[in-house]
């Protein structure tokens, strides 16, 4: 059986941690930042965990993660 290819965009966006969850950078921190509060921007800086409903999609994109 041939090797499965990973989705290259998913490789760049998601990292698997030791507990098997995937972490990713949060959105809404690229532009139009003047109207967003400092507290909101600070919270967006940190990584977020992929939800249970989306985890299977990420796993299918990253077969060897």
From Swiss-Prot:
PROSITE patterns: RIBOSOMAL_L35
Gene Ontology biological-process entries: translation
Listed Gene3D superfamilies: 4.10.410.60
Molecular functions (GO terms): structural constituent of ribosome
SUPFAM superfamilies registered for this protein in UniProt: L35p-like (SSF143034)
HAMAP family assigned: Ribosomal_bL35 (MF_00514)
Database matches in PANTHER family: 54S RIBOSOMAL PROTEIN BL35M, LARGE RIBOSOMAL SUBUNIT PROTEIN BL35M
Name under which the protein is recorded: Large ribosomal subunit protein bL35
Organism: Baumannia cicadellinicola subsp. Homalodisca coagulata
Gene: rpmI
């Amino acid at each position: 059986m041939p090797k499965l290819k990973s989705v290259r965009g998913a490789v760049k966006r998601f990292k698997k941690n030791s507990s098997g969850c995937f972490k990713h950078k949060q959105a809404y921190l690229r532009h139009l930042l003047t109207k967003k509060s400092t507290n909101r921007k600070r919270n967006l800086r940190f990584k977020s965990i992929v939800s249970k409903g989306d985890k299977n999609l990420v796993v299918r994109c990253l077969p060897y993660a």
